[in-house]
A protein has these predicted regions:
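Cap/insert and terminal regions of metallo-dependent hydrolase folds
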Residues: 6, 10-15, 22-26, 34-125
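Short Pro/Gly-enriched beta-strand edge/turn motifs at strand-loop
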Residues: 1-3
């Protein structure tokens, strides 16, 4: 999506591509993202570093924990797990280093010993 179309769809969020002008090296910072659509996937493919939305491990995490009645998708956040989650979305993008940011305190990946943390780490996060 181009900047000219930003805000034309519900769920649009801003991500940044930060470039060192003298070297051309860059990274992406995307703290909120509802879905990794093909145009975004094409931009991220082969990147050396991406900081990405790690708000929730599962879409219904906040509901299951009794914290609120909104899903991650409704709040504009892709889940880490599942067939539409960020682990699956990044699987074939060839990103060298991936770091989750904006991790909600309800997210079990914060627990170093949790199976969710181990799944994220095993997937290169």
């Amino acid at each position: 999506m181009s900047a000219a179309n930003f805000g034309s769809r519900e769920g649009d969020t801003i991500g940044l591509k930060v470039t060192e002008t003298s070297t051309g090296r860059y990274f992406f910072y995307i703290p909120g993202c509802a879905e990794v659509e093909p145009p975004l996937a094409r931009r991220l493919k082969g990147a050396s570093l991406v900081f990405f939305d790690g708000t929730l491990f599962t879409d219904d995490e906040m509901i299951r924990q009794g914290l609120m009645q909104k899903t991650g998708a409704r709040m504009g956040h892709i889940s880490i797990s599942g067939p539409q989650g960020s682990i699956a979305a990044f699987k074939d993008l060839g990103v060298a280093r991936k770091i989750y940011v904006h991790i909600n305190n309800s997210n079990p990946v914060l627990d170093e010993n949790s199976p969710e943390r181990k799944a994220a780490e095993a997937s290169g996060w």
